[in-house]
Design a protein with these regions (language model features):
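Catalytic-core "active-site belt" of small-molecule-metabolizing enzymes
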Residues: 1-116, 123, 154, 158, ...
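Beta-rich strand-turn-strand
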Residues: 130-140, 144, 150
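Short, well-ordered amphipathic alpha-helical segments that serve as non-catalytic structural scaffolds
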Residues: 121-128
């Protein structure tokens, strides 16, 4: 089981997410892409946990969501399963993800918590980057957004996200 050392984090939270791998370099001249062709750009899906860490010296409420996102001020670490699944392996509009702390169920989340379908987040990101002239490249990953609320990590806890047939992500925060 992976161990994350608390000395490298300030105020971390864990978010279970469905992630995607890019199949080939994306041709920006073919943008904008749509839900009809987005799957053709993707090699597969995998389960992951993003560790967000707030490194500001004032409370999150004083920073504001726009400032936080615009500075990429929360993304810090990404844990992922090595197994890549076919994108049609699950129903992305309704797939349950269970989140545990010390083997106690905290929440049964769902992929529909990510803009109703994680592919909507992927589509937005790819089209936004294409507009800026920044293509995504083969084998890059996209983490689509949390299926549950974010959970604070406390030293000495064990974290597990159960993605059903896509597998488990587990780690200990020491």
């Amino acid at each position: 089981m992976e161990k994350l050392n608390s000395k490298y984090f300030f105020e971390p939270f864990a978010e279970p997410e469905i992630s995607f791998r890019i199949k080939d370099d994306i041709d920006i001249s073919k943008a904008p892409y749509s839900m009809d062709n987005i799957k053709n750009l993707l090699d597969g899906i995998l389960c992951s946990i993003e560790i967000v860490d707030f490194r500001f010296n004032k409370p999150l409420a004083d920073i504001g969501a726009i400032n936080l996102v615009s500075t990429n001020g929360a993304s810090d670490y990404w844990i992922y399963n090595d197994k890549i699944y076919n994108i049609d392996e699950i129903d992305l509009t309704d797939f349950e993800v269970s989140f545990f702390i010390d083997n106690k169920l905290q929440e049964k989340g769902n992929t529909n918590n990510v803009l109703e379908n994680p592919l909507n987040a992927v589509l937005w990101l790819i089209n936004t980057l294409c507009k800026k002239g920044e293509p995504m490249l083969k084998n890059q990953f996209i983490s689509s957004g949390s299926c549950t609320k974010a959970y604070r990590l406390n030293t000495g806890t064990r974290i597990k996200a159960d993605f059903g047939k896509l597998g488990l992500i587990e780690f200990e925060y020491i």
